Structures are given as C-alpha cells and as structure tokens.
C-alpha cells in the first residue's frame, strides 16, 4: 500500500521488480487516482480490501507491505482480523498521533504545494533544514498525487494525524516486520507504541536513513530486502 496522498502508479514503478518474484496486488486509496471517490477513513479502505481479498483469494494473503501511511493502514487491516495474512512489512509506520492541529497545518502545506505544482513552500524548506532534513530525505513528496480533492486531502490528513494503534492487532497471528530509518523519530516512536501489542515481530532500523530513503534512493537493495524477508517468512 502506497504512502499518504501518493500516486499508486508511481509506487508501482518502484516496486515492479517484485512482480517477477510474486503475484502482486496494488491497491489504491480513495482520493489518490483519477475518477476515484473521496477518501473517507482507514476503516473504509480496509473494508474494500477485505471484500476484494475474500472474493478473489478466499480471505487469505501470503503477505502485505505498506510504506508510511500505507503501513499505518496495513496495521489497521491486521487489527481487524477479517482476513488472514501470514506476513506484513510495515515501513515507516506512523502512529505518533500529533493531533488535529498538525493535520490542519499539513493540509495548508499540501494545498500550497498542489497550487505550486508540487514545489516545496519556502517555509517548509526552512523547517526541514532546521530538522536536519534535506529534500532527498523527503522522497515521498515526488510520488504525491496532486489531483486529490480538498475533501480527500483534509480527511486523509486528519485520519493520519489522529489515528491510534488499534488494540485488536494484539490478536493477530501475522508475523510483522517493522522497518524504518534511524533518522525517523516518529516512526521509531511508533515502533515503541505498536510493539506493546505485537506478539510476533522483527524490527530493522537502517542507520542514517530518513523517511523512505531506502525505498527511493536504494531501490534495488530495498527490493532484495523485501524478497529475502518474504521468502524467509515462508519457511517459518
């Protein structure tokens, strides 16, 4: 599952090497593709996935992968326990719950970027610099879907920044792989939060890496990491 307000087709281009090793399915969140309905909630997205998997694959998947908000959505899917998933890779998961104020600020930033054709507002570059982040640490912005409606953007961001861990994930038998970079404070905080509930997980933190850095800058190695992880999971 792709990241927050991102174009699923751009994610597919990065992940194409996986098509050679696995039978892959690329869901797209509502509000993030041409002709789609507006985004409503993570629960609504999960229900659509559950209906598809139940109707086409008997309610079972060998594995799921999600990056950033996609990882958060996958955690909700696992917590609902309506389909069986053997393994889940959650990369850069976001469960920090910064609140509505952060959603409102992000909405204004995204709106300005949409109006400017995806260019970073000057004040955002300053904030990133103060945080020690360069533009290459924000690779996910290059994959955003800039035709999302204002309603989808606002609702999606509010869901993202107010979501909390669903305690139902404690009942999941899925083997969970938590991945993030060493320069991702919110993802690492999210790891600490979700590990309180998981009964079967492995954690990998890549030193010196920012949000999405492995996927966007070291794509070939990242693809190999996914393949090795999922093939190893089959042997468990």
Predicted segments with their positions:
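Conserved HGGG/HGGXW glycine-rich cap/lid loop of the alpha/beta-hydrolase fold
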Residues: 1-34
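Active-site loop/oxyanion-hole signature of alpha/beta-hydrolase fold enzymes
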Residues: 25-63
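Gly/Ala-rich beta-loop-alpha elbow adjacent to hydrolase catalytic centers
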Residues: 65-74
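Flexible "cap/lid" loop of the alpha/beta hydrolase fold
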Residues: 79-80, 85-116
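Conserved alpha/beta-hydrolase catalytic His-Asp/Glu region
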Residues: 99-101, 117-170
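Short beta-strand/loop motif that positions the catalytic acidic residue
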Residues: 172, 178-180
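Acidic catalytic loop of the alpha/beta-hydrolase fold
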Residues: 182-187
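Catalytic histidine-centered segment of alpha/beta-hydrolase-like enzymes
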Residues: 209-221
């Amino acid at each position: 599952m792709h990241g927050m307000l991102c174009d699923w087709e751009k994610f597919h281009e990065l992940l194409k090497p996986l098509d050679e090793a696995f039978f892959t399915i690329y869901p797209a969140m509502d509000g993030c593709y041409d002709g789609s309905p507006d985004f409503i909630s993570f629960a609504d997205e999960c229900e659509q996935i559950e209906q598809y998997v139940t109707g086409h694959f008997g309610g079972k998947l060998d594995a799921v992968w999600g990056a950033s908000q996609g990882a958060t959505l996958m955690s909700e899917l696992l917590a609902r326990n309506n389909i069986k998933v053997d393994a889940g890779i959650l990369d850069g998961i976001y469960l920090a719950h910064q609140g509505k104020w952060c959603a409102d600020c992000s909405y204004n930033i995204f709106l300005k970027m949409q109006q400017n054709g995806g260019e970073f507002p000057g004040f955002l570059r300053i904030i990133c610099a103060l945080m020690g982040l360069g533009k290459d640490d924000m690779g996910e912005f290059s994959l955003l879907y800039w035709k999302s409606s204002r309603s989808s953007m606002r609702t999606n961001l509010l869901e993202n920044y107010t979501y909390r861990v669903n305690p139902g994930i404690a009942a999941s038998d899925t083997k969970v792989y938590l991945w993030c970079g060493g320069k991702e404070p919110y993802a690492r905080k999210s790891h600490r939060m979700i590990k309180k509930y998981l009964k079967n997980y492995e954690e990998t933190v890549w030193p010196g890496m920012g949000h999405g850095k492995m996927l966007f800058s070291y794509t070939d190695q990242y693809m190999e990491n996914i393949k090795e992880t999922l093939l190893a999971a089959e042997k468990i």
